[in-house]
């Protein structure tokens, strides 16, 4: 299988190629089209993605027309990043008449964690996280080589946006946490999920995991026509109004005061 994967869900722009059972990838930090003084402007996803795809295909000696499918990180995540990934994947898919595979960003985090039972929490801003929980059973000898083991993936609870104190608590021991939500809301999530066996806040969405999950989904017949693919936003609001911002600050102050009083 030849499968191209791309992910612009969060701050890192990444692409990967699954070619004859071997995964190769490259990534770069991306900004959102703004610069933060005094450092230089960070290139945006839209500036980075196509050159990275061209460079990876050239490095691997694979023409775009050789691809069987294109997978992309569909969300949840940065609304702008999701639209860029979906738009680029659609453009490429339509150009070469290949299907797309939309991969949930939280499932890619759970896969990247390497754990069998993982709760993925991605900082959603506005006092919330995107979260979901998965059971993943990996086994050797998958059809796409050692970089993509055969796997069954059970969604224990579906992706959602919620406050850290409202994250569903999975039943049973052995669960691990992954994602930057565990650093952005460390105290609240530790209180909500005290029984987690471990936490890795460094795990983030990325094209390598998107490629692996995309290959599994493609084999299962879950690819769609490029024109039908769409991001999965989970929520439809990107900013708080002034009253909501004030309420969020007040709530944070109350939590800090309560924490200090214990």
Task: Put a short name on every predicted segment.
Residues 22, 28-44, 99-205, 219, ...:
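Surface "functional belts" at beta-alpha junctions
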Residues 56-60, 95, 113, 210-218:
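Stable alpha-helical structural segments in soluble proteins, enriched in small hydrophobic residues
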Residues 58-65, 93-103:
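Phosphate-handling active-site elements
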Residues 71-99:
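DPxDG-like acidic metal-binding loop motif
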Residues 243, 250-251, 256:
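Amphipathic, membrane-active segments
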